[in-house]
Structure formats: C-alpha cells, structure tokens
Amino acid sequence: MALIPDLAMETWLLLAVSLVLLYLYGTHSHGLFKKLGIPGPTPLPFLGNILSYHKGFCMFDMECHKKYGKVWGFYDGQQPVLAITDPDMIKTVLVKECYSVFTNRRPFGPVGFMKSAISIAEDEEWKRLRSLLSPTFTSGKLKEMVPIIAQYGDVLVRNLRREAETGKPVTLKDVFGAYSMDVITSTSFGVNIDSLNNPQDPFVENTKKLLRFDFLDPFFLSITVFPFLIPILEVLNICVFPREVTNFLRKSVKRMKESRLEDTQKHRVDFLQLMIDSQNSKETESHKALSDLELVAQSIIFIFAGYETTSSVLSFIMYELATHPDVQQKLQEEIDAVLPNKAPPTYDTVLQMEYLDMVVNETLRLFPIAMRLERVCKKDVEINGMFIPKGVVVMIPSYALHRDPKYWTEPEKFLPERFSKKNKDNIDPYIYTPFGSGPRNCIGMRFALMNMKLALIRVLQNFSFKPCKETQIPLKLSLGGLLQPEKPVVLKVESRDGTVSGA
C-alpha cells in the first residue's frame, strides 16, 4: 500500500498552491516591523508571538524591554503591536494625539450591546458617553456616595471578625471579593447584598458568571489568531459577555429604574441614580441622553472593571503590609491619629491621610492592574520621528515601566516613601500610569481609590495582619491575562482587641 496517495499532478499542484496561500495569509503582516527597522521577537505563522505569553504578559514585556530597549514590535496573531516606553512618545499617544489618532482601544471580541459601554465605545460615541458620564464621577458626587461605601466597610469588618474568630488563616480574596462586589452592585444596580453570606443570591451568581474572564483562554486566543471570526460571531449573536447574565442585569436595571421613577422621595446618590438623572437633565441637550440600553451597559462595565481590580489590589496591599510590619504600624498610627477611637472615616478624613495614599500608590506601582495600556492607530502618523502605520496597536507596558531600574531605585522593593510629598514630584506621570493617562484614562479612578482606602481604614482600625505558613513568600503572579496572585493571599489576622486567627 502506497504511503503517498496516487494523485493527479493537477491535484498536487492545487494542494501546493493552497498551502503556499495559507502560509502567505498566516504571515502577511509579519514583515511590517522588520521593514520599519523596529526590533522584536520572531513571529510564527498565524500565531505571531502569542506562544510567548506562556510566562504571562508581564514577564514577556519585561524580557522584551530588557532585550530590545525603548521600542519593539511583536504580533498577536497577525495584529502588529508596537510597544513604546519613551515618556514623550507615551504622552503623545495618550494625551496630545488622543482625539485625532489614538482614540480607541483594541476590540477584544464580539460584545453585542456592550459596544456602548464607555470602556469599549469608539470615536464620537465614546466622546459623547464620556461627556455624559464625567459629571457622575466628580469629587462632589463621590463625597455623597461615601456613606454607601462605608456601610459595606462595616460589613467587611464583621465578616473579617467572624473569620478571625475561627482561629484559621484568612483567604483575603474571599472577604475583599465580597466587599468589592457589594459596593459595586450597590452603586451600579441599587441592590443591597451581603454576598459573602448570601452566595446563592441570583445577583451574586450572575455577577460571578460575568467575571469568569481571561484574555489567555482558548476563545480569546482563537479570535486573536483568526480576527475574521469576530463579525461572524456577532452575526450568530455570540457574545463574550454571557447572554443569560446580561439579560438578567438588563431586567434588574429596568425594574430598579421603574421603582425609583415611581417613588417621588429623594433617592440616595449612586451611579444608577446619577445616570437616571442624566437621562432627564436639560444639561445633556448638547449630547443625546443615555438610552436605557446604554445605561445597562455602563452598569455592567462598572462591575467588570471594578470587581476584580479592587479585590486584587486590596489583597496585594495587605500582603505588603503583612510582610512589612513597620509600614503597617506606621499606617495604623496615622489612621488612629486622624480617626481616634475607631471613628468612621469621611471623604475629607480620607484625603488627610498622606501615608495611606503613599502605601496605595506604591502597591499600584508594583501591581498595576492594567498591566498594559493600548491604543489603535487610526491613520498613518509619525511621532517623535517614528512612522506608525494605520491599524497598528500601540502598547504601553505599564508593569515593565513601573519596575524599570532607570526610573526607580530598587524597583522590586516595596517603599511607600517614593510617593512622599518630597519625592513624588520626581515621578514622571507618563512612566507611572496605574489608571492610564489623558482623556481616555480610567473614568472611575477617584471612586476606585476612595473605595479601597475606605476599606483599608476600617480593616486596619480593627485588625493587624501577619504572614503564616500558608502565605506564599515571595508572592508570585498568576500567568493568566489578569494581574492576580498565583495563589490567593492567605494571612493571619489579629484583632486589635485581642482575637487571633491563624495562630
């Protein structure tokens, strides 16, 4: 029996031509950076450099920065990605040319009606949403929301106390994840849940389904390698956000909105109420008001952007405080001085706490949740003498820049003093970008910081944290697409009144 099929010459020729065409399709963009004289790792047909992500985005970016210097090019599938680390170039991309050239983020799959969410929307649609939503995130509005957030800080303390009383080490992801979910579902959807003690609540179950998300899972990798699948999936009504979950949340917002419109009493200030108010405001006449579907999309994206990030950063902060007891003690002393006898924090007292701000900023330097910032180049452009063709994704590797010894002495060390009044003026705002920069930075930055600081104050007023045998030291990062610890942070919790967990 012949090992090679006995095919006609025409068939062999057709097969050879098909293979050549397939190879050309799989590599058609891969010569771009070589042609532009930009260094970078060698791509594979179809895959580009995505196999290099097996160590995680952070390590890939750190290695490339070390090997290639200020600028390098690589390929996600066939998508050319240009990494830049020069602060002047970063400023041009994020600020100076934001509206004209670098307005949009990279599309990440079929998103359905979520294309109206502020983090995903593009061009004029994004500008309109930003104008409508910016008043929702002012310091004045945030001040009015502090009592809602503080209420869940008290729930967090109760949950931690109960965990501490068991005498076992505490997995911080559980308690901080519940706090984060409670605050965001309350402010975005107007529902009150103690999610740690009510895991069966339909809101908790649906929100958790929404958050099972990893940019390195096979679905996202397949649409990275074969981007032509995205419009096909859109036509087939397939969406990266689970439809059963978005339908549930749409109905919930509709119900809550109807209930609030029927009730003539003054409602509490939360994101949902502020968005409902903006729909009826005369001030929005220059822009088309938010539609009901757009309102739902913003509520969902607030959960999506805020849940994982808040709980992860709080876990990272507590890990650093537990492994740096001198910093923890100094922070507790500041909190006790500003708020004696465990007085509840207010918006103004939080702003008085300089050392708290330093600790949070230094943690965000070591663990920037947005490991990368990306903008799509809308047209051929030259910036700082470098030509960037239309369609290239420009990427700023925040994690690598936050640990670059050129800008930070002993970059791997946790040193809050970097952000003291005396030192912070030396920090380049385009090297330290935990929330992005420019017009398209994180719109919820103030809210996220206040949310985390209120939690930290309440927790540190009541507890001290120490490493235990289950604590992973040094902490390792997950290789997934989100910046998280490889293993959940587990610590011993001591009540400042005397109770000990994990002893």
Swiss-Prot record:
<dbReference type="GO" id="GO:0009822">
    <property type="term" value="P:alkaloid catabolic process"/>
</dbReference>
<dbReference type="GO" id="GO:0070989">
    <property type="term" value="P:oxidative demethylation"/>
</dbReference>
<keyword id="KW-0560">Oxidoreductase</keyword>
<dbReference type="InterPro" id="IPR001128">
    <property type="entry name" value="Cyt_P450"/>
</dbReference>
<dbReference type="GO" id="GO:0042178">
    <property type="term" value="P:xenobiotic catabolic process"/>
</dbReference>
<dbReference type="GO" id="GO:0034875">
    <property type="term" value="F:caffeine oxidase activity"/>
</dbReference>
<comment type="function">
    <text>A cytochrome P450 monooxygenase involved in the metabolism of sterols, steroid hormones, retinoids and fatty acids. Mechanistically, uses molecular oxygen inserting one oxygen atom into a substrate, and reducing the second into a water molecule, with two electrons provided by NADPH via cytochrome P450 reductase (NADPH--hemoprotein reductase). Catalyzes the hydroxylation of carbon-hydrogen bonds.</text>
</comment>
<dbReference type="GO" id="GO:0019825">
    <property type="term" value="F:oxygen binding"/>
</dbReference>
<keyword id="KW-1133">Transmembrane helix</keyword>
<dbReference type="GO" id="GO:0062189">
    <property type="term" value="F:anandamide 14,15 epoxidase activity"/>
</dbReference>
<dbReference type="GO" id="GO:0004497">
    <property type="term" value="F:monooxygenase activity"/>
</dbReference>
<dbReference type="GO" id="GO:0016491">
    <property type="term" value="F:oxidoreductase activity"/>
</dbReference>
<dbReference type="GO" id="GO:0008209">
    <property type="term" value="P:androgen metabolic process"/>
</dbReference>
<dbReference type="GO" id="GO:0070576">
    <property type="term" value="F:vitamin D 24-hydroxylase activity"/>
</dbReference>
<dbReference type="GO" id="GO:0006805">
    <property type="term" value="P:xenobiotic metabolic process"/>
</dbReference>
<dbReference type="GO" id="GO:0062188">
    <property type="term" value="F:anandamide 11,12 epoxidase activity"/>
</dbReference>
<keyword id="KW-0349">Heme</keyword>
<keyword id="KW-0753">Steroid metabolism</keyword>
<dbReference type="GO" id="GO:0030343">
    <property type="term" value="F:vitamin D3 25-hydroxylase activity"/>
</dbReference>
<dbReference type="GO" id="GO:0101021">
    <property type="term" value="F:estrogen 2-hydroxylase activity"/>
</dbReference>
<dbReference type="GO" id="GO:0062187">
    <property type="term" value="F:anandamide 8,9 epoxidase activity"/>
</dbReference>
<comment type="similarity">
    <text>Belongs to the cytochrome P450 family.</text>
</comment>
<dbReference type="GO" id="GO:0046222">
    <property type="term" value="P:aflatoxin metabolic process"/>
</dbReference>
<dbReference type="GO" id="GO:0016098">
    <property type="term" value="P:monoterpenoid metabolic process"/>
</dbReference>
<dbReference type="GO" id="GO:0019899">
    <property type="term" value="F:enzyme binding"/>
</dbReference>
<keyword id="KW-0752">Steroid biosynthesis</keyword>
<dbReference type="GO" id="GO:0006629">
    <property type="term" value="P:lipid metabolic process"/>
</dbReference>
<dbReference type="GO" id="GO:0002933">
    <property type="term" value="P:lipid hydroxylation"/>
</dbReference>
<comment type="pathway">
    <text>Steroid hormone biosynthesis.</text>
</comment>
<dbReference type="GO" id="GO:0042359">
    <property type="term" value="P:vitamin D metabolic process"/>
</dbReference>
<feature type="transmembrane region" description="Helical">
    <location>
        <begin position="2"/>
        <end position="22"/>
    </location>
</feature>
<dbReference type="GO" id="GO:0042572">
    <property type="term" value="P:retinol metabolic process"/>
</dbReference>
<dbReference type="InterPro" id="IPR002402">
    <property type="entry name" value="Cyt_P450_E_grp-II"/>
</dbReference>
<keyword id="KW-0276">Fatty acid metabolism</keyword>
<keyword id="KW-1207">Sterol metabolism</keyword>
<dbReference type="GO" id="GO:0050591">
    <property type="term" value="F:quinine 3-monooxygenase activity"/>
</dbReference>
<dbReference type="GO" id="GO:0062181">
    <property type="term" value="F:1-alpha,25-dihydroxyvitamin D3 23-hydroxylase activity"/>
</dbReference>
<dbReference type="GO" id="GO:0102320">
    <property type="term" value="F:1,8-cineole 2-exo-monooxygenase activity"/>
</dbReference>
<keyword id="KW-0503">Monooxygenase</keyword>
<keyword id="KW-0479">Metal-binding</keyword>
<dbReference type="GO" id="GO:0042759">
    <property type="term" value="P:long-chain fatty acid biosynthetic process"/>
</dbReference>
<keyword id="KW-0444">Lipid biosynthesis</keyword>
